[in-house]
Amino acid sequence: MADIRQNIDKKANRRGAARLAAVQALYQMEIGGAGINDVFAEFESHWLGSEVEGDKYLPAEAAFFRDVVAGVVRDQARLDPLIDDALSRGWPLKRIDAILRAVLRAGSYELEHRKDVPARVVVSEYVDVAHAFIEKEEVGMVNAVLDQIARRFRAGEFAR
């Protein structure tokens, strides 16, 4: 039983690392104009599971990382209006910091497409990712926006 729990924890940690890397990659693509193939190559060879500038990055589930990044890029034109609808009036997505946009886009993509991960886990994981980059009050906004989007895509999970 302990071995099963360890394997689940390792997979969760690898996915958490993939989420963090996906948000960093999406941010880099938006700010630096990097292409998706360049970002994949850079992250997979230099970041995932490596030490960069004194920070040790956990090994990440590369396929999960690729899925989230590619999915956000593919679906961004459809995801952005959904996020805009969930944001407070007067705060359109374009007014929000780029790293926060990356967190919300990645979380929204995963809520819509990764049904293998419970909605509450997705929201919690991206709140944790947000803590790595942004202030406390903005983390609350990430929680509220992703919770609203989760209820839209996965209402059945919240009816229980």
From Swiss-Prot:
InterPro entries: NusB-like_sf, NusB_fam, NusB_RsmB_TIM44. Belongs to the NusB family. One of its GO terms (molecular function) is RNA binding. GO terms for biological process: DNA-templated transcription termination; transcription antitermination. Pfam families: NusB. The keyword DNA-binding does not apply. The keyword RNA-binding applies. Keywords: RNA-binding, Transcription, Transcription antitermination, Transcription regulation. The gene is nusB. This is Transcription antitermination protein NusB. One of its GO terms (cellular component) is cytosol. It comes from the Bacteria. Involved in transcription antitermination. Required for transcription of ribosomal RNA (rRNA) genes. Binds specifically to the boxA antiterminator sequence of the ribosomal RNA (rrn) operons. HAMAP family: NusB.
